[in-house]
Amino acid sequence: MGNPQPAGLRIVGVTSSSDTDPTGYARPRVPTGYGVATGLITAAVAMGVAQLVAGITGPQGSPVVAVGGAAIDATPAPLKNFAISAFGANDKTVLVIGILVLLAVFAALIGVVAVRRLSYGLAGLAVFTLIGLLAALSRPASGPADAIPVLAGAAAAVLVMVRLVRAAAGTTARAARPASSPGSARPEPGQPGQDELPTGHEPGASWVPAGAGQGAGSPAGARPADQVAQPDRRRFLVNGSVAVAVAGVGALAGRALSERSSVAQARASLHIPRPQHTVPGLPPGADLHIPGLSPFITPNSAFYRVDTAIILPQVAPSGWQLRIHGMVERELTLTLDQLLRLPLVENYTTLTCVSNPVAGPYIGNALWLGASLARLLRRAGIRAGASQLLCTSTDGFTSGTPVQAVMDGRDALLAVAMNGTPLPVAHGFPVRLVVPGLYGYVSACKWITDINVTTFADAQGYWVPRGWSQQAPIKTESRIDVPNGAAPLRAGRVAVAGVAWAQHKGIDAVEVRVDSGPWQQARLAAVPGIDTWRQWVWEWDATPGNHTLLARATDATGYTQTARQAPPEPNGATGYPTVAVTVQ
């Protein structure tokens, strides 16, 4: 058993989970602000060190990236659609900010707990470490190295938390005797003296007389636990400043190391051969050049981006390979040099995201250049019964493309260029899949590295188990670009214009209606083929008042866009696009 504790002493510091420790000494309160600061600084160091290590092992091991990816995986489709519609291309940024805010809140709470009971604070760190490890190791393309940043950050966090908690509790553990009184005796041998620390307590606790701080004005019987500890402010400030500096340097150095893996220079120096099969120039009148109308060719910088990548994969051309395997007679593996030596094909193709709402922005048209996927599959020899190409990205994302859609004669490409330049990194550099006529989640795998020829019964792409359809042909739709309803119109002749699409079928007609009036035929622009959207315009003699404009398209099969309103899930939105306008 430990030595009996001297009567009349209490602890100032972090020693017990209750108001008094097992020996009866009171545990005072550490100011809450010190706890909040302890938690936030600890979290900052953990993130900074983890970022530094992730710059070496790979950015996908960053805890924020890993947790963000896991959050995307677990996000229900309605919430995903809301995020895309509300934040657009900034949805990933909003997600990361949200993760950091939640981290700060919980870190502050853990810090408040830690200055009262260090072991509880360390337990909180252990929980966060476990979450980070599970997120890092559960990613589709993860490996053991992805756990290293999380573990390194956790180790640094433990060291910082311990030092800050001790500083918050006071610098030196000392014992003080009550004031001498006549007849008072010196401590007996074996009892703690003035410079001894009673056993069973953590370093950092300060020992003072139980009556200390209770002057004549103190109420009789006041509990010592009501006293507030006196942190070593200087020590806390020094330790905290050093920790913040470490966090900042780690974050900046980690970012610099990550940027070293950028493929921007490799992309700029990549030579793309001329296509063997070029498309004719755009026919006259393909672009109506109406102010506010989407241009026929979407610039790369304006092309929509919807994917699951928190950070853009940086795939070096020299290390890229594509494997074609599964239900084939001959497995194929191609490097980028080998792919570029194949006959290359150009094609104008409009891509559409299945998350696009009626009249939404997640659609774009580009001139793609690449190798024919059908040609490669014929070389591999597809076995009877194969129905799906399960395509995998370098970051583990998968999409399931119907074999029939690739082999029916359409220009399904392993694209290497977009609008005359190598693919932008955000759009799949160095190679992506482009299959006309299908929504992007089953036809446009970016950063593609693997094609498994299989069946829909044996494998599912990423979004299918999350509630989206296996088969996803693009629906016949239209959009009104101008007028947009943002400003009043003048009475008189007004150009109502927009785009319509029915990829791999083609648009044959677009009609416009004002309020409940009759449908009016719009004039269609020329197109180079059936795989692109089509511009249209209708001249309206606008009359004063409030009006609603509607549009509908008819494709080359005779199908007319439905008025039935449906959300994007599970296979694309439907309904008429409408614009409310005021004419003065």
What are these regions (language model features)?
Residues 93-182:
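Membrane-embedded alpha-helical segments of integral membrane proteins
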Residues 1-119:
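Membrane-anchoring hydrophobic segments
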Residues 222-244:
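N-terminal secretory signal peptides and thylakoid transit peptides that target proteins
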Residues 20-23, 167-227:
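Intrinsically disordered, low-complexity terminal tails and inter-domain linkers enriched
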Residues 30, 34, 38, 42, ...:
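Alpha-helical transmembrane segments of integral membrane proteins
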Residues 56-60, 90, 116-117, 167, ...:
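Membrane-interface elements of multi-pass transporters and channels
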Residues 227, 245-247, 252, 259:
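Extended acidic/polar, glycine-enriched regions
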